[in-house]
Amino acid sequence: VREVSELAYADYIQKELPRHEYLGELVGEKLIYYPTVTREAFRHTGRLTTAIESGKLFEDIGLKPLDPTVDRAMICGSPSMLKETCNILDRQGFEVSPGLGEPGDYVFERAFVE
C-alpha cells in the first residue's frame, strides 16, 4: 500500500486473528504478516515485488526464497501488481493455474486483470 493508513487488515491480522477460536492456532504457527508501505516511513518500505526480487523479504522473515517445488502462492492486488508478481513467479519456474479447479503453483485474482 502507499500509506500506513491503508493497511486495512493490520489490526485484524495481528490482534484478532491469532485469538480466533478455530484459526488462531494455525495462524500463530503458519501466517507471516509482512506489511510494506511505499510512500511513508515505516518498518518495511518499498514495493513487495522489489523485496521478493532482491531477497529482502526472505531475509527479513527468515525463510528461503520461493521455490516452486515446495511453495504455492495466491496473489491479489492491483492489475499492475498482479502482472509484475506473475512475471516474477513465471521467471522462477512457477506454473500458473489455468483456471478454476485446475492445479498450478500459483493462482491470482482474475476479477481485476486487464
Regions found by a protein language model. Name each.
Residues 5-114:
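Reductase modules of NAD(P)H-dependent flavoproteins
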